[in-house]
């Protein structure tokens, strides 16, 4: 006679009759085993759900990591910006920055000798043009066959030349004369102070 096997209790019943199975299913051991079985089943389902969500999250994070890796590779492939060089060290082949034009000196200011005058002050007459009509920038050597020497030097005798480069159309200032030295005695009321020869007498005294 075959016996009935209970999956929840993992036991064989003595008889396979419906009355015996009904009596076994009504017992407290069978009910406790059924409760434990479904609790384990729910725990397994919950764990499998958690594992699935974790795998999905890791898959998305992996996709983000792949995108980030591709972006980093793209950034590394781009050329880096040039480094700032310290002032005074220019690489070979590069032109230095263009400096602004010098400011015009104030009215009446004369540049030192040897320095070419960039701009004449307002109202000053312009120097005469060269003989052959070719203008040269200040500081440039003269053209062969044309009079004049380098800036700051007088023209060579026998050759025609224009005014010096520092000429601005104004006459030179008069020489500065110092006052005669005072006598060491400090006598400022001496009548013979202006007379260079004190022994000479005036013609009025002889009369």
Curated annotation (Swiss-Prot):
Matching InterPro entries: Matrin/U1-C_Znf_C2H2 (IPR000690), Matrin/U1-like-C_Znf_C2H2 (IPR003604), U1-CZ_Znf_C2H2 (IPR013085), U1_snRNP-C (IPR017340), Znf_C2H2_sf (IPR036236)
Recorded GO CC terms: commitment complex; U1 snRNP; U2-type prespliceosome
A molecular function (GO) term: zinc ion binding
Keyword terms: Metal-binding, Nucleus, Ribonucleoprotein, RNA-binding, Zinc, Zinc-finger
Subcellular localization: Nucleus
Sections of the chain in a coiled coil: none
Zinc finger motifs (Matrin-type), residue ranges: 4-36
SUPFAM superfamilies noted in UniProt: beta-beta-alpha zinc fingers
Bias kind Pro residues: ranges: 105-115, 122-131, 162-183
Gene Ontology BP terms: mRNA 5'-splice site recognition; spliceosomal snRNP assembly
Domain of life: Eukaryota
Principal location listed in the UniProt entry: nucleus
Residue ranges of the region described as Disordered: 105-207
Low complexity: bias regions: 132-144, 184-207
Protein's UniProt keywords contain Ribonucleoprotein: yes
Subunit structure: U1 snRNP is composed of the 7 core Sm proteins B/B', D1, D2, D3, E, F and G that assemble in a heptameric protein ring on the Sm site of the small nuclear RNA to form the core snRNP, and at least 3 U1 snRNP-specific proteins U1-70K, U1-A and U1-C. U1-C interacts with U1 snRNA and the 5' splice-site region of the pre-mRNA.
UniProt function note: Component of the spliceosomal U1 snRNP, which is essential for recognition of the pre-mRNA 5' splice-site and the subsequent assembly of the spliceosome. U1-C is directly involved in initial 5' splice-site recognition for both constitutive and regulated alternative splicing. The interaction with the 5' splice-site seems to precede base-pairing between the pre-mRNA and the U1 snRNA. Stimulates commitment or early (E) complex formation by stabilizing the base pairing of the 5' end of the U1 snRNA and the 5' splice-site region.
Annotated family: Belongs to the U1 small nuclear ribonucleoprotein C family.
Record protein name field: U1 small nuclear ribonucleoprotein C
